Structure formats: C-alpha cells, structure tokens
C-alpha cells in the first residue's frame, strides 16, 4: 500500500512538472515596424483624425494567423501581436500621415478640435501564407470630409516574400507589406486632397 501511494505521488508530481513546463514557455510578442516616410506635417494644412481600425474575422485577434499548404488556417499560441492588427496598422498609418506633407495635424480620437477629415478603416486580413511563402495584408480605408461626406475609399493589398522559415523572417516581410500599403494610401489620399471633386475609387 505504501509503495502504491508513493507511485501515485510521483506520478502526480511528474504531471505537475509537465504542466509547469508548458505554462512557462515564453510568449513572443510581435510588433509591425514598417519603414516610414521622411517628411513632416504641412504647415497650415487640413487636420485629420485617424481612429482605431477594425479587423475582419478571423483576424480580429492578437494571434498570428498562418495559411498552411492546402488552405488550412492556423493561429499561433506562442507568437502573438503586441496589439490587434487593426490597432497596429492604424497607429503606423497615423505616424506616416504626420510625415507625408499632407496634413497640418494628425490626431488620435478624441481630437481636441473638429478635424477637417476623419480616416477610418479595417484590416481585411494579415497572415503568413506558407504556400506562397509570403506575408500578406489587405486593408480598406475611407476618408470622410466634415461633416460627413465620403471623400475617398480605397482597398490596398500587398504580399511580400518571406525569406526564411522563422517568425522573424515573417515579421520583416509583414512590416514591409504594411509599408507598401501605407505608401499606396499616401498617394491615394494626396490625390483626393488635391482634387476636391474626386469621386471615391478603388484600386484595380
């Protein structure tokens, strides 16, 4: 009886140690760091408030999404975004708009004044495509002129090759993809601001 009790205790301890080992595996937090333009604000330019972007399911999570070969989706447990894709993209776009010589001020809501424009959007997808070996992002953005007139609507998508099989390689490619869509949106917004009569358009 005593030996049986000792065996049960040992088994319980081993199971507990295994659980502790699983729980202490570190989570790797990732943040998009796209290269940003080297400009500044435009003196006397219009003002814009850039709100938090939404993210379409199943990408409305901090877990890194992977499209495996065969089209199956997987979501990492130990590799997570430091914020949701919508939050990160909106923050990086906000930073970029402060460097594109387009606006006199770029605000995070709530803005301290009634801005001339409001920029809203959503991340349609952000994932690691294993089959095409690329980092893919697709976003949509709407530019609203005060008080509530649609001044522009665009969809941008970029796919950048992932040069390696590590999460670091994916992160570098994803950051480059975000930089590409931000650069494209910069051109879209510049065109809309230069032509007040411009009709909303979509990238082919």
Indicate residue ranges for each PLM-predicted region:
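Short secondary-structure boundary motifs at beta->alpha junctions and helix caps
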Residues: 74-80, 147-184
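Surface-exposed short loop/turn segments
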Residues: 18-30, 35-39, 95, 99-147
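Compositionally biased, intrinsically disordered linkers/stalks adjacent to structured regions
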Residues: 170-204
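Extracytoplasmic/secreted envelope proteins and their assembly/folding machinery
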Residues: 86, 90, 94, 100, ...
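Bacterial N-terminal signal peptides that target proteins for export
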Residues: 1-6
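C-terminal motif of bacterial Sec signal peptides marking the signal peptidase cleavage site
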Residues: 13-16
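A structural "domain/chain start" motif
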Residues: 18-85, 192-204
């Amino acid at each position: 009886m005593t030996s049986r009790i000792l065996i049960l205790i040992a088994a319980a301890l081993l199971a507990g140690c295994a659980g502790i080992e699983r729980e202490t595996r570190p989570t790797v937090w990732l943040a998009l760091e796209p290269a940003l333009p080297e400009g500044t604000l435009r003196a006397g330019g219009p003002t814009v408030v850039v709100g938090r972007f939404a993210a379409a399911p199943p990408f409305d999570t901090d877990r890194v999404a992977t499209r495996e070969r065969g089209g199956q989706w997987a979501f990492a447990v130990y590799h997570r975004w430091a914020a949701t894709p919508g939050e990160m993209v909106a923050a990086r776009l906000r930073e970029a708009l402060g460097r594109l010589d387009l606006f006199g001020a770029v605000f995070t809501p709530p803005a301290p004044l009634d801005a001339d424009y409001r920029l809203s959007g959503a991340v349609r997808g952000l994932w690691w495509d294993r089959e095409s070996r690329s980092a893919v992002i697709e976003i949509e953005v709407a530019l609203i002129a005060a008080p509530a007139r649609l001044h522009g609507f665009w969809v941008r998508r970029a796919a950048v090759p992932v040069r390696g099989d590590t999460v670091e390689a994916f992160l570098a490619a994803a950051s480059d993809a975000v930089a590409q869509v931000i650069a494209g949106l910069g051109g879209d917004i510049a065109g809309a601001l230069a032509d007040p009569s411009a009709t909303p358009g979509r990238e082919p």
